[in-house]
Amino acid sequence: MANESKCPFNHAAGGGTTNRDWWPNQLNLKILSQHSPASDPMGKDFDYAKAFKSLDFQALKRDLTALMTDSQEWWPADFGHYGPLFIRMAWHSAGTYRTADGRGGAGSGQQRFAPLNSWPDNVSLDKARRLLWPIKQKYGRNISWADLIVLTGNVALESMGFKTFGFSGGRADVWEPDEDVYWGSENKWLGGDNRYGKDPESMQPPGEGTLVAEPAEHGNEESRTNQGERNLENPLAAVQMGLIYVNPEGPEGNPDPVASAKDIRETFGRMAMNDEETVALIAGGHAFGKTHGAGPADNVGPEPEAAGLEEQGLGWKNSFGTGKGADTITSGLEVTWTTTPTKWSNNYLENLFGFEWELTKSPAGAHQWKPKNGAGAGTIPHAHDPNKRIDPTMLTSDLALRFDPTYEKISRRFLANPDQLADAFARAWYKLIHRDMGPLSRYLGPELPQEELLWQDPIPEATHPLVDDSDIRALKGKILASGLSVSELVSTAWAAASTFRGSDKRGGANGGRLRLAPQKFWQANQPEQLDKVLKVLEGIQNEFNAGAAGKQVSLADLIVLAGNAGVEQAAQNAGHTVTVPFNPGRTDATQEQTDVESFGFLEPHTDGFRNYAASTYRVPAEALLIDKAQLLTLSAPEMTVLIGGLRVLDTNVGKTQHGVFTDRPGTLTNDFFRNLLDMGVEWKPTSKTEFEGRDRKTGSVKWTATRVDLVFGSNSVLRALAEVYASSDAKEQFVTDFVAAWAKVMDLDRFDLRQ
């Protein structure tokens, strides 16, 4: 601006010192309102599943196949084929998934946004997505970016001679970055000290992320690298800030293949991959393409989020030589693994075991490996000069597959049996790109495999007539006459439904897995009480199914219906007549359809809705409540009304009375909020996590509470919501809102209802 000093606006709206700057420990409630309809340009009536079904899928695949060899001057294809670049794009989109909280993954196209679009491990993937833009533009809303990124990786494999296991669409895009994902607390790229506990002073304040609580279960927070062990902070699944998995040079840049194997096993395991799947993914993925380290990293400019406007969303502008083609700098490593980098082969393993390797450095100065004594010289094609041949090279993380005893055994078997590698890679790749898709009812398209896969948490289809309104009324009558309390009915239904995670769409009441291992043994589910309730409900189920002339009710449905009956009874106790929405159609999975180890990741070690914590955590309980609420896709008002209702329904684990601010438990009243906001009560801590509320006049203890309870009076936003429900005219609204939020949680996994 020519006269900038006279501009009346020195700062734009939203700038300046923020509340978070003043109070860095402030509870982050914004994660409960992200991805609102206001941010979605597609409109509230847009149905992506319907749009995808109208897609000319085969025409799209033909266009993608043609793109693979349509090299562009502005970003030339290595070896004349973009396939390896697109495989990396899809892999790095899906590979952010982690089992601990189900977050990350390819499910919403987050690679387009910060921080992922600017991670050091994603250098040059901005170019991959830009190459795809003409195709995305052509097909528009019928293919999401999330689906297109993954499908392009699949087509890339097929175009280079590999037979994939299948593909499913159904990943709807979002339009802003996920703010709920904890990627670590380091404040510099490729930092890793905090996640291994070596620099605790620089960690973010409590409330940021979920740090390890129980060493026996998750490992200590302190690093024990000197003893050969590294203990990675939960829920992270990458060794350094901005990496997908491991440092390819070795742990902290130390070129030790055996140590690298430990990092690989830890990080791939946290992405739900076992040793065989891990070897297959690495050996299969590295059958193609190359890495890029033509020159020193100081030639590379800022990442996309820091680049100038003129770069138009691209980043990492390279001043080395031409800045592209043979002069490309991505990881700083310059490795080509095979003689056939654009064709499926077993040459990766042939080279890995066919040569003895010695340490060398890339042109950028990064640790990598070459065959000893010049073996294999000139056997590898040059990516951009058909008249040149180069030597084989490997990464430290590649040599891990040879020098780790377990990985070596698997790798040698794949070397001797290429068909086994092909099958294992096809299956592991399919799992990688679909791990966060949820139940099969969300899968779309003509290339779905017919085989039932255990990691998909299969649920049988209902093959019998469902219960009707008359049956539902009769069943609720039997449930309420069974002798089970409101608390028992509601607690059991919550235990089943609240395992749902909106992140990877796992869990929920459908499947009836509450009656199976491991869920029936979880401490949070109160196994003794659960066994009692399930026996009663199974009796009602058996009686109904024996005399229903073909109609059947699953235990999964009956558990939810029992919870609904409890809520309706509690509302009636308070003078309100309500009917909780109920949608039959859930079925019961078998123990054989249930991966006990995999379901273990859904176990709630804390659940603020039930005032439950298995142990003391570094992160405050109220922050963990917000985390749980976000996984349940709840808004702040929904979370608030559920807490208030569940407390007065006496659903705390172990029947503790913390937060049960009522003298009429089992009655659906707004007593929790009225008594929480009562200025006649003074609160004092009895420990870091528990409090007593004493009558200001008499000094006698009226109530006890946890941090989760008191945050609804302490946090200004939550207090504003609590005041709504504590008001004299809010009794009916409270019941109505509780019923709506309850019904939402009960149906979170019913994707079949939304098709």
Swiss-Prot record:
Record's GO cellular component terms: cytosol
Residues reported in the UniProt entry to bind heme: 286
Superkingdom assignment: Bacteria
EC numbers: 1.11.1.21
Cofactor list: heme b
Molecular-function GO terms, alphabetical: catalase activity; heme binding; metal ion binding
One Pfam family matching this protein: peroxidase
Mod. after translation: Formation of the three residue Trp-Tyr-Met cross-link is important for the catalase, but not the peroxidase activity of the enzyme.
Enzyme class: oxidoreductase
HAMAP family tied to this protein: Catal_peroxid
Function: Bifunctional enzyme with both catalase and broad-spectrum peroxidase activity.
Protein name in UniProt: Catalase-peroxidase
Species this protein is from: Pseudomonas fluorescens (strain Pf0-1)
Phylogenetic placement of the source organism: Bacteria, Pseudomonadati, Pseudomonadota, Gammaproteobacteria, Pseudomonadales
Gene: katG
